[in-house]
Amino acid sequence: MNINATLIGQSVAFLIFVLFCMKYVWPPVITALQERQKKIADGLDAANRAARDLELAQEKAGQQLREAKAQAAEIIEQSKKRAAQLVDEAREQARVEADRVKAQALAEIEQELNSAKDALRAQVGALAVGGAEKILGATIDQNAHAELVNKLAAEI
């Protein structure tokens, strides 16, 4: 292999080309590659953060859903207790009203019974006086009659 001036000229030209590329071409290419690498790393970090945020949001949503279900169950339980309480109160009021109506009816019955007894006593007294008049054949004095009726009514 012959080393001649052409080979030396080509080597010098190649060396100048390499130096030119290292000085003017290579730094922008390296900078562009570093920027691209940084953008890719930032994108991956953002994707990881988004995945973590999504997972946290899903956990939070699940927790809120469980809390809402628990609150709903508690509200339903309170409603059932309140309904049972209202039913018990209504039953108690109905029982009190029934007792009042029963007492009033018993009082009316007692009053009517007493009225019937008084009327019956008066009729029995009149019948007794009438029967006595017929037996004796004479009328009895009015004062004596009233006294006998009262005595008879008291005995009855």
From Swiss-Prot:
<comment type="subunit">
    <text>F-type ATPases have 2 components, F(1) - the catalytic core - and F(0) - the membrane proton channel. F(1) has five subunits: alpha(3), beta(3), gamma(1), delta(1), epsilon(1). F(0) has three main subunits: a(1), b(2) and c(10-14). The alpha and beta chains form an alternating ring which encloses part of the gamma chain. F(1) is attached to F(0) by a central stalk formed by the gamma and epsilon chains, while a peripheral stalk is formed by the delta and b chains.</text>
</comment>
<dbReference type="InterPro" id="IPR050059">
    <property type="entry name" value="ATP_synthase_B_chain"/>
</dbReference>
<keyword id="KW-0472">Membrane</keyword>
<dbReference type="InterPro" id="IPR002146">
    <property type="entry name" value="ATP_synth_b/b'su_bac/chlpt"/>
</dbReference>
<keyword id="KW-0138">CF(0)</keyword>
<dbReference type="GO" id="GO:0005886">
    <property type="term" value="C:plasma membrane"/>
</dbReference>
<keyword id="KW-0406">Ion transport</keyword>
<keyword id="KW-0375">Hydrogen ion transport</keyword>
<dbReference type="Pfam" id="PF00430">
    <property type="entry name" value="ATP-synt_B"/>
</dbReference>
<dbReference type="InterPro" id="IPR005864">
    <property type="entry name" value="ATP_synth_F0_bsu_bac"/>
</dbReference>
<dbReference type="GO" id="GO:0045259">
    <property type="term" value="C:proton-transporting ATP synthase complex"/>
</dbReference>
<dbReference type="GO" id="GO:0046961">
    <property type="term" value="F:proton-transporting ATPase activity, rotational mechanism"/>
</dbReference>
<dbReference type="InterPro" id="IPR028987">
    <property type="entry name" value="ATP_synth_B-like_membr_sf"/>
</dbReference>
<keyword id="KW-0066">ATP synthesis</keyword>
<keyword id="KW-0812">Transmembrane</keyword>
<dbReference type="GO" id="GO:0046933">
    <property type="term" value="F:proton-transporting ATP synthase activity, rotational mechanism"/>
</dbReference>
<feature type="transmembrane region" description="Helical">
    <location>
        <begin position="12"/>
        <end position="32"/>
    </location>
</feature>
<keyword id="KW-0813">Transport</keyword>
<comment type="function">
    <text>F(1)F(0) ATP synthase produces ATP from ADP in the presence of a proton or sodium gradient. F-type ATPases consist of two structural domains, F(1) containing the extramembraneous catalytic core and F(0) containing the membrane proton channel, linked together by a central stalk and a peripheral stalk. During catalysis, ATP synthesis in the catalytic domain of F(1) is coupled via a rotary mechanism of the central stalk subunits to proton translocation.</text>
</comment>
<protein>
    <recommendedName>
        <fullName>ATP synthase subunit b</fullName>
    </recommendedName>
</protein>
<keyword id="KW-1003">Cell membrane</keyword>
<keyword id="KW-1133">Transmembrane helix</keyword>
<keyword id="KW-0997">Cell inner membrane</keyword>
<comment type="function">
    <text>Component of the F(0) channel, it forms part of the peripheral stalk, linking F(1) to F(0).</text>
</comment>
<comment type="similarity">
    <text>Belongs to the ATPase B chain family.</text>
</comment>
